[in-house]
Amino acid sequence: MIGVNILSVVTMRAEPSDKAEIVNQILYGETFDIMEENEKWSKVKLKHDDYIGWIDKKQWKKAEQHQQTTNVVKEIFQPITIDDKTIFAPMGSFVEKRKLHKIDYKNSILHDAKLLLETPYLWGGRTFM
C-alpha cells in the first residue's frame, strides 16, 4: 500500500513510540510505502530516498497511486487549500498546482535565507519546525 502525508510535516521515528529518536521528517505531499502497521503506528519507507521509520497512523492517508507531483514549495511556508481548509506546507513540499495560493516575494531567496538565520539544529529535521 502507498501512503501520502496530509500534514505540513510528519515526524518519523526510529521506533513506534512518541519518545523514540526522530530520524527524519516527511513533508506535505511526500509518498511512502507502508511496510508494517500496529494499533497506533505505521512503519514506512519513503519513495524519494528509501528512508525507513515509524509515523503515527493518523498522519497519513492511502494514496490512490504513486503520483509524486513536480510542483515544489519554494517559500518558507506556502498556504494551500485541502478540503476547504488551509494548511501551510513548508519549503520543499510537493503540492498540486491547483492547490497553491500566489505569493510574490521580490527577493525571495534573500528573504527566505534571512528567515532561516539562527534556526536551531533539529536532528532528523528537514525544516525549521
List PLM regions with ranges.
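N-terminal charged segments
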Residues: 22
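Catalytic cores of peptidoglycan-degrading enzymes
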Residues: 112-129
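Basic, ligand-binding patches in group-transfer machinery
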Residues: 29
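SH3-family beta-barrel domains
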Residues: 1-16, 25-26, 35-38, 45, ...
